[in-house]
């Protein structure tokens, strides 16, 4: 599994090197997919049958990573447009990107909420608390993009969001 993921990342790097400015192909979605698979890969490889709770976990990671990447594209819209980079925002527009982010946030909250109906696992509570915190921080970055654009704070905060699960693991399991 790891070799397949590594090969897909290698193909991505070759692809963006040769085609990056020519055509938009959805790199944000691909990167979010690779991120979510990479996080879950050790568990996927370890177990025979993937339980529904792991699928919920993966979908939530994918949505959060997608929000993060499209949010960065939206904030960097003018710079990317000027430099000729293709991104979701430069192809679809900053306003459309904002709408997609809001739809993804709404979908995340629906999936997050429904997990409490379908899963009774106590361990789920810790992860769900971190996930809703991550989504809340990303929503805050979206709402304060003008202020956070200065000194690129949006990027620092947006990247730190993905460190929160590690902090949670250290605190709870450490």
Task: Report each predicted region and the residues it spans.
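Intramembrane alpha-helical segments
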Residues: 1-44, 141
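Small-residue-rich segments of transmembrane alpha-helices in multi-pass membrane proteins
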Residues: 28-44, 90-96, 156-169
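Membrane-helix boundary/juxtamembrane motif in polytopic membrane proteins
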Residues: 25-26, 84-99, 121-126, 153
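Transmembrane helix-loop-helix
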Residues: 1-17, 100-152
């Amino acid at each position: 599994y790891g070799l397949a993921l590594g090969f897909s990342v290698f193909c991505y790097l070759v692809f963006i090197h040769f085609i990056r400015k020519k055509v938009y192909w959805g790199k944000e979605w691909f990167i979010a997919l690779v991120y979510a698979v990479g996080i879950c890969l050790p568990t996927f490889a370890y177990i025979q049958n993937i339980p529904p709770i792991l699928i919920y976990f993966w979908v939530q990671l994918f949505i959060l990573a997608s929000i993060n990447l499209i949010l960065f594209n939206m904030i960097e819209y003018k710079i990317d447009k000027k430099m000729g980079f293709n991104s979701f925002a430069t192809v679809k527009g900053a306003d459309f990107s904002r709408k997609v982010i809001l739809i993804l946030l709404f979908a995340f909250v629906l999936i997050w909420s429904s997990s409490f109906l379908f899963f009774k696992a106590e361990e789920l509570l810790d992860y769900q608390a971190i996930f809703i915190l991550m989504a809340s921080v990303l929503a805050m970055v979206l709402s304060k993009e003008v202020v956070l654009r200065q000194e690129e704070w949006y990027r620092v905060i947006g990247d730190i969001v993905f460190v929160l699960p590690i902090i949670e693991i250290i605190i709870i399991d450490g």
